[in-house]
From Swiss-Prot:
Pfam families: Acetyltransf_1 (PF00583), Bromodomain (PF00439). Residues 70-82 have a biased composition (Polar residues). This is Histone acetyltransferase gcn5. Residues 31-41 have a biased composition (Basic and acidic residues). The active site is at residue 191. The bromodomain mediates acetyl-lysine binding in histones. Disulfide bonds: none annotated. Belongs to the acetyltransferase family. GCN5 subfamily. Residues 11-22 have a biased composition (Low complexity). It comes from Schizosaccharomyces pombe (strain 972 / ATCC 24843). The lineage of its organism: Eukaryota, Fungi, Dikarya, Ascomycota, Taphrinomycotina.
């Protein structure tokens, strides 16, 4: 990256900036694992924002209810008899819950920070002893955790005065992780250059807590609202969990030529949410959840707990679902029973469906849509041991027959290999197989199963 860029980075207020909870007045020093929310926290702007968001949903629900009432005066759930009809009125949607009853389960990293085990500090190369100790410790972590990155390159950027580092520090300035970034405040974004946690410290949730500290610090000290970073295949999952996406909405003219480009990396962007303090996100979500549950309980009977059924006291027995107390009231119907019997899709179904759809829609897929006809090619099934085509793959996919991603990839390879085995290399079929396989492997490398690609 050229050193002649016009953008100047904003230096931190001091050589080593303490980013612990003492700099965030809304952060509590309570070390209780399940922390109840205090009544006076309703004055917290983030709490008010959470309730306001919930109230906004309430207003929408009330509006929808009025629209519904104009055509029908009653709200009737599926499977509920006329005697169970209930009019949905706006007063049913009022927020009515004790905010002090909301409990937030805090992660180990948060508890360690509150108890003083770890601290979060923003460090720059200002030639002071403490800064150099922390930057050197962070450099050693990056060198170990990022073995493919040249050591000289890491060293140059860590000590570069245009870069800042958010570090996790234990006793005696012992660094256990951090993020090195370069702010481009005039352009409205910051580039995350390196991000790593020491291998023996990666089970305490440090990574997420570190990113939350970085977001709050950057937004609190600059006008920056966006992050850009290049992530390798192993880091994409982490960045997705932190709100990053592969969809880049920033105009290229803003960042091209300013950030470092890495071969084989995936460019990702994170746009911070206005008015959200990321270190208090768990509190905001807990309050919103409590508000939603409160509203649900006012218009449904989902919170009612019925006693056990006497019919099972004498051993196994059969009972119609309609005879189970409360089931009809929540909208049970026969169709639900049939749906529950259908096999559930595997966790990787969405990925396989995407890969199949991409293959099916590719211009080179036409020869492989249906099984090879025995009438047109009599000896095909004598030569080919494992015949395969896209219609067979689709049948297996729709019927949940793939037990693993590897099985799906194996069937796709059968299509390509069978075609090349039976046809000459100068034929259209052979060339289509090559093109489709190349496209398939490219799409596979874009998923979390990229390690299975050739």
């Amino acid at each position: 990256m050229s050193n002649s860029l016009n953008d100047q980075t904003r230096p931190p207020d001091s050589s080593v900036v303490d980013s612990t909870s003492s700099n965030f007045p809304n952060a509590s020093n309570d070390s209780v694992h399940d922390k109840p929310v205090k009544q006076d926290e309703q004055s917290n702007p983030n709490v008010r924002e959470a309730i306001a968001n919930s109230d906004g949903q309430e207003s929408l629900a009330v509006k929808e209810n009025k629209d519904t009432e104009s055509s029908s005066s009653h709200f009737v759930p599926n499977g509920v008899s006329n005697s169970k009809k209930r009019k949905l009125v706006a007063t049913d949607l009022d927020v009515d819950f004790d905010i002090s009853s909301v409990r937030v389960t805090e992660k180990p990293s948060v508890l360690e920070e509150k108890s003083g085990v770890i601290q979060f500090r923003v460090v720059s190369n200002d030639d002071t002893a403490d800064s150099m100790i922390m930057l050197t410790g962070l450099k050693n972590i990056f060198m170990k955790q990022l073995p493919k990155m040249p050591k000289e390159y890491i060293t140059r950027l860590i000590y570069d005065r245009n870069h800042l580092s958010m570090t996790i520090v234990k006793d005696n300035l012992h660094v256990v992780g951090g993020i090195t970034y370069r702010p481009f405040e005039q352009r409205g974004f910051a580039e995350i250059v390196f991000c790593a946690i020491a291998s023996n410290e990666q089970v305490r949730g440090y990574g997420s807590h570190l990113m939350n500290h970085l977001k709050d610090y950057v937004r609190g000290t600059t006008t920056i609202q966006h992050f850009l970073t290049y992530a390798d295949n192993y880091a994409i999952g982490y960045f997705k969990k932190q709100g990053f996406t592969k969809e880049i909405t920033l105009d290229k003219s803003i960042w091209v030529g300013y950030i470092k480009d890495y071969e084989g990396g995936t460019l990702m962007q994170c746009t911070m949410i206005p008015k959200i303090k990321y270190l208090e996100a768990n509190l905001i979500l807990a309050i919103q959840k409590a508000a939603v549950v409160s509203k649900i309980n006012r218009i449904t009977r989902s919170n009612v707990v019925y006693p056990g059924l006497d019919v099972f006291k004498d051993g196994p027995a059969h009972i119609e679902p309609s005879q189970v107390p409360g089931l009809m009231e929540v909208g049970w119907c026969k169709e639900m029973e049939e749906l529950s019997k259908k096999p559930r899709p595997k966790p990787f179904f969405a990925v396989l469906e995407m890969l199949f759809t991409e293959m099916q829609n590719h211009p080179s897929s036409w020869p492989f849509m249906q099984p090879v006809s025995k009438e047109d090619v009599p000896d095909y099934y004598e030569v080919i041991e494992h015949p395969m085509d896209l219609s067979t793959m689709e049948f297996r996919l729709r019927n949940n027959q793939y037990e693993s991603v590897e099985e799906f990839i194996r069937d796709a390879k059968y299509i390509f290999d069978n075609c090349r085995s039976y046809n000459d290399s100068n034929t259209t079929y052979y060339k289509n197989a090559d093109r489709l396989e190349k496209f398939f492997q490219k799409k596979l490398r874009e998923t979390e199963y990229s390690h299975l690609a050739d």
